[in-house]
Structure formats: C-alpha cells, structure tokens
C-alpha cells in the first residue's frame, strides 16, 4: 500500500538513509518478511500469471539477536537481495480513514487528501506519510461523491520499520497493511461477479473485510479476540442450535458482523455478498455453526489449500499456521494491478 520508493520524502530522508538497490536478477513473486517479538515469518508467493497463487515458502525462524543481524542472515541464506520484498505495518502503527475524494487531478490527489484528513489523525499530518486507494462503485452512487481510503503513518514509525531492512541490504519495494493483505486473500475466494466477507481473528481482535472483483470495499476492526472466544464456549445445545450468553463474545461478534454487513448492503446495494469466510481459529466449527444460525448468508471455513498451491509446505496444511501467517501470505500475494 505504501510504496517504499515513495518514502524518499524530505521529512523522512532526514531520519534514515533509504538504500533501495535493484537486484541484478529478480525472482518472480513477492516476499513478505514479518518481524514478531519471538519470531520472523518469511512468505514467498507468486500469483501473477498463475491460475492459482503459488506459495513457494512459508518459514518460521526464531528471533535471536538484533533485527538487522537476523535479517542479514536471512538475506544470505534465502538470497533475499534477489527478491522483491515487502513488510506489514502493525495495527496501531497507522490509521486508515474513509474520506470523500477531493475533486482534483490525479497527481494532486495525495496532497489534497493530506489536507482533508489533517484533523482526523492522532498525529500531525506534516509528520506523516499518506497514501490513498479508491473505493470502487462510489463514483456518483446514490448522488454521493466518490470515496477513498487514506492510509497515514508517522514518518518515525515508517523509519523504524525500514531501518533494519536497510541495514541488512534487503530491498523493500512496498509497505503494506493488514486490511489490504486480507483483501488479497479474499480475492482468491470470490465467486464470479460476487463479493465475499472474510473475518480473521487473533489475540489482538478481529478484522472484517468485504471485497468484490479483487477490490476492498469495506473494512472493520472488531473488539473480540480469539482468546475471549476460546474462554467462552457454548453454554448449552438445544435443538441442534447453540445457545450462548447474549452478553458473551459470540453474541457480540455476531451483532458486530450483522451491523457491518447491513451497513455494507446500504452503501453498496449493487454488490451481492456471497458468503462470510472464517479464517482458521480454535473452535472454528462451533463459531461457524453459531454465526450461520444468526447471519443472513452462508458461513464457511477458510481452507487455503482449496485456492492456493503449497503442496510441499507441510506446515501450511495446519490451520493454526494458516491463521498465523494469513496476512503475511496476503501481503506476498499483492499484485500491482490491484492498486
């Protein structure tokens, strides 16, 4: 989403020397390198020109030592300098805001959006990088002006994220965010001419995206964690229907999803959402059955093996590993045509 070469802004250039050197020979696809406190995930995917996306690598490395030292070892072992590379910003490191598209020329759009969102940010816009993505189907819809997503992140946050890669001589091509990474996964799940809602959950909360035609139409953060669902469980089963506390996390999640989907239907009546897909989590079958009884559309469990090729990566057949790497996989599936 945020293109690395565009980071050569005066405000950021004073903080860090960006060092992007095109490798002599590039491998196909994109590599996402995701740094966590205890591990490093590396995913290499090739999607352009393939009938089904191919996952060539989905590795886990224990994080020992400084970030730059780890990345230097990975660059050497995996020849990362011969790949196009990307990283994901963490939730909380950026803001994504839906705004009315300014009526300006395309090359003036980002500056106009910076001015428009200046009072919506939690930090000064002069200290931020800003990128934009159009929301399809909003041009003149119901008499409303076109809408777009504005993504903003502090220059200091971007600088800190890039620095270990720069120190390790790993060429970053783009910086992405989970909303658009999840869109890339959802693109593989869409029935022809229809949209799909995809819900991922982890111990930081939930992320719902609605996509159609490979484009992101709506996103929403949901304050229900995987841990809270694990700790709840069904209270009882009557007539093959799960009955849970109305104030519990299951019910809160169902209500948030229904409100989000109803809101989407009002905004985009021209887009038919075919189904809700749940990313793999603990107790996914229970959650699927619960939501299927409360939502007005089919609910399915995500199975990446049905839409991607990764036969040689045994670990990725484990649903727990799929959800652990879901957004890294999505970031590696990014194609320029989607932007």
State what each model feature region is.
Residues 1-339:
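Hydrophobic/aromatic-enriched cytosolic interaction surfaces used to assemble or bind macromolecules
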């Amino acid at each position: 989403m945020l293109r690395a070469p565009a980071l050569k802004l005066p405000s950021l250039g004073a903080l860090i020397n960006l060092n992007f050197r095109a490798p002599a020979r590039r491998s196909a696809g994109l590599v996402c390198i995701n740094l966590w406190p205890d591990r490093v995930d590396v995913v290499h995917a090739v999607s352009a020109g393939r009938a089904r996306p191919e996952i060539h690598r989905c590795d886990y490395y224990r994080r020992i030592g400084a970030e730059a030292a780890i990345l230097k070892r990975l660059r050497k072992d995996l020849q990362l300098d011969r790949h196009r590379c990307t990283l994901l910003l963490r939730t909380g490191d950026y803001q994504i805001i839906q705004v009315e598209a300014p009526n300006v020329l395309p090359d003036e759009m980002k500056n106009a959006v910076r001015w428009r969102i200046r009072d919506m940010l939690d930090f000064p816009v002069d200290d931020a990088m800003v990128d934009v993505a159009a929301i399809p189907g909003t041009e003149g819809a119901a008499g409303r002006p076109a809408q777009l997503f504005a993504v903003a992140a502090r220059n200091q946050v971007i600088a800190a994220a890039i620095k270990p890669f720069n120190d390790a001589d790993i060429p970053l091509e783009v910086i992405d965010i989970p909303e658009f990474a999840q869109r890339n996964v959802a693109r593989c799940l869409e029935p022809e001419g229809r949209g799909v809602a995809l819900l991922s959950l982890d111990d930081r909360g939930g992320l719902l995206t609605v996509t159609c035609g490979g484009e992101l139409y709506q996103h929403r953060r949901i304050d229900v964690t995987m841990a809270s669902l694990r700790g709840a469980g069904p209270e009882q089963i009557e007539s093959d229907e799960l009955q849970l506390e109305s104030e519990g996390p299951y019910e809160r999640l169902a209500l948030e999803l229904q409100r989000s989907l109803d809101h989407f239907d009002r905004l985009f009546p021209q887009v038919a959402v075919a189904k809700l897909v749940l990313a793999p989590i603990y107790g996914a079958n229970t959650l699927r059955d619960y939501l299927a009884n409360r939502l007005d559309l089919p609910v399915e469990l995500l199975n990446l093996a049905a839409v991607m090729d990764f036969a040689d990566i045994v670990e990725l057949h484990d649903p727990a590993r799929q959800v652990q790497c879901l957004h890294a996989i999505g970031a590696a599936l990014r194609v320029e045509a989607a932007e």
